[in-house]
Structure formats: C-alpha cells, structure tokens
Amino acid sequence: MWALLVTQSAHTWGFWMLLTKIPSYIGSVFDTDIQNNGLWSALPYLTAWICSFPISYISDVLIKRNVLTVQASRKICNTIGEWIPAIALVGLGYVTKEQPGIARALLIFAVASNVAIYCGHNVNHMDLSPNFAGPLMGITNTVANICSILAPLIASVIVKHPDNVGEWRNMFFLTSIIYFLGNLTFIVFGTSKIQEWNDPIKEKKDISMSSATESSVEKGYAQREKDTEKMDLGKES
C-alpha cells in the first residue's frame, strides 16, 4: 500500500505540474499567441486519450494470454507512464527558444506516455483489495492530491521569470526526479497480491477457529489428566 501511495503521489505531482504550467511555458518561452497556445497545450492530452485505448488493450491481452503476470504488467506500464515522461522532461530542459517544434514533440511524448499509469498503479487498488478498492483509492488519492496543490505553487517559486529557459529546466528536472523515485519505489516494493485486511470476516473466522481448536486441545488435556487420576485411584484401591 505504501509503495502505491508513493508512486501515485509522484504521478499526481507530474500530472498537475504539466497540466497547469504547459500553457505558461509555451506562451512565455516561445512567445505563442493565445489561440495557438490553446491548441498546442491541448494536443498532448488529445494524443494521450488516443493512446489510452491501445495501451489498455495490449496490457489486458498480455495478462490474459499469460505472457505477463498481473504484477509484471502493472510495473511495466507504470514504468512507461512515469520514467518515459521523466526522460522527456530532462530533454525538454535543454530545448532552446529557437526549437519550439522539439519542445512540443517532447511535451506530447511526455503526456501521451503518462496514460500507461492507468494500467499500472491506478488499477493496483483492485489488486490489493477487491473489497476495499474504493476506500483505498480515496485514501491514496487524498494524500496524493496534496501534490496537486504543491506542484503549481513550487513551480511558481522556481519559475519566477516565465520566459527564462533555465528556470523551467530546474522545474522539469525536479519533476523528473520525483517521477523516477516514485516509480522506483513501486518497482521494488509494489505488489499485486491481495492483502490480508481485504477479508476481515475470514480473518475473524480464522481467529475463532484457532481459539476453538486451542480450547478443544486444552479440554482434551484436562480430560486426559482426570482419566489418569481416576486410573491411579483405582489402582490404589
């Protein structure tokens, strides 16, 4: 659960940083008018929506055909969804004002590949706890959304001059590091195994059965001692 929380927080940071700051980056660094800015800011998300269909289908097919385990599929998709955007953002940090085409291509690449997380950690809640996937999503999403507040605020602190490529580079590098560490945590500690707390009723039954078994054993020993005492008394008499 903790690995899921960390990677979801990392994704939320990157998602909201890009969503809220792409228009400012494109408009200020490349001096794009508001009409073209709107088009170029929306294009990465349109591409992401289109890419979500084949990614979901391929992930599902690979699991059904036993090419990948559920856990392997989750981690591979999550890696695509967080490490590829991290690499794209590092590249974006070195794009100059004279290279708007490269910047737009990298932004599209970063945002489009990010949708793979919907076959990664975003469905991991159902893997961990089919019975409590909703509450689990509520808990992790609540904590992760703190990052959705912090990301734009910290971006505003780092990028004080929106037309300064160097300041944007620092912000992109920070986001790349967060993406990298978030997914690394999920790769190392993440799991798709159903957790014990998923079925509290069964757990109570197991405890009750264990207690009942222990009581039966104790009664058996007590009865055996009584029988032994009776036999000893019989011999003495």
Per-segment meaning from a language model:
Residues S52-F53, P130-P162:
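A late C-terminal transmembrane helix in Major Facilitator Superfamily
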Residues D31, K64-R65, K97, N124-G134, ...:
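Paired intracellular helix-loop junctions of major facilitator superfamily
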Residues S9, A42-L46, W83, I108, ...:
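Transmembrane alpha-helical cores of Major Facilitator Superfamily
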Residues I26-F30, I58-S59, I63, I154-N164:
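Interfacial helix-cap and linker-helix signal at transmembrane-aqueous boundaries
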Residues D33-Q35, L39, V70-I76, V157-I178:
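A membrane-interface helix-boundary motif in multi-pass transporters
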Residues D163-S237:
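Intracellular terminal tails of multi-pass secondary transporters
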Residues Q71-G120:
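C-terminal transmembrane helical hairpin of 12-TM major facilitator-type secondary transporters
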Residues M1-S56, N114-M126, S148-P152:
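Extracytoplasmic gate region of multi-pass secondary transporters
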